[in-house]
């Protein structure tokens, strides 16, 4: 209940700011959806980069009892793990979400996290868009009662959608933690694109009725 109170009190403001288009490939032979999926990855990483540039090292690594003793760095490293693992698997092979390291330099050093983010942006910008349609197997431990992991068929594009949505939810938690520490979180940070769209439509409808 304490965390839920913090979520209510300190959630970052939801501003109807559209996610900017950061990257547009000149390859017009790939589906428009592939262009948009790649743009969503780049925009999400750029949001993280902006946040890291605005907070201090101490705020990045501070562990908060109200957030299960987690840190912004821990949540952010977790997001980058998914984008990095997916990028590597997109080029060749299958994807295993369980193959991640915890307590790394990215989690404990803000500048290392900034550099890792920028490297990922470059990697995703160079990705051949046709790869997003590639089918592969995804492994992740989802069952508490078993010792093994579970595997399912998927596609790179489908996992891009998951990685972005996953990051947005962790960004929301990061926003809560930043609010607890009194930080000014960028407007729209941790707000889902569908939520921003809904807010825009609601505001437009309210304006039209006045």
Predicted regions and their residues:
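Polybasic, lysine-rich low-complexity intrinsically disordered segments
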Residues: 5-6
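Short hydrophobic alpha-helical segments enriched in small aliphatic residues
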Residues: 9-11
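Short, Lys/Arg-enriched N-terminal segments with co-localized hydrophobic residues
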Residues: 13-27
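Extreme N-terminal tail/first-helix region
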Residues: 24-46
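Short, helix-capping/interhelical loops that line the mouth of catalytic, cofactor-
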Residues: 27-32, 81-126, 132-148, 183-210
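Alpha-helical transition-metal enzyme core signature, strongest for iron centers
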Residues: 41-48, 72-86, 110-124, 163-174
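Helix-loop segments that flank and shape redox-cofactor active sites
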Residues: 47-71, 87-105, 147-153
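Short conserved catalytic/interaction loops centered on acidic-Pro-aromatic/His motifs
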Residues: 171-189
């Amino acid at each position: 209940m304490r965390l839920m109170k913090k979520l209510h009190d300190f959630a970052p403001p939801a501003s109807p700011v559209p996610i900017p288009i950061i990257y547009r490939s000149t390859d017009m032979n790939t589906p428009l959806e592939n262009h948009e999926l790649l743009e969503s990855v780049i925009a999400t990483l750029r949001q993280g980069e902006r946040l890291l540039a605005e907070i201090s090292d101490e705020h990045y690594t501070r562990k908060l009892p109200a957030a299960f003793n987690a840190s912004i760095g821990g949540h952010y490293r977790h997001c980058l793990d998914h984008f990095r693992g997916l990028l590597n698997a997109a080029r060749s092979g299958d994807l295993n979400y369980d193959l991640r390291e915890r307590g790394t330099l990215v989690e404990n050093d803000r500048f290392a996290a900034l550099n890792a983010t920028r490297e990922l942006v470059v990697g995703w910008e160079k990705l051949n868009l046709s790869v997003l349609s590639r089918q592969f197997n995804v492994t992740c431990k989802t069952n508490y009662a078993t010792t093994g992991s579970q595997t399912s068929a998927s596609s790179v594009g489908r996992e891009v959608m998951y990685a972005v949505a996953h990051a947005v939810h962790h960004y929301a938690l990061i926003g809560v933690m930043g609010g607890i520490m009194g930080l000014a979180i960028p407007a729209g940070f941790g707000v889902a694109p569908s939520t921003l769209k809904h807010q825009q439509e609601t505001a437009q409808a309210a304006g039209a009725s006045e």
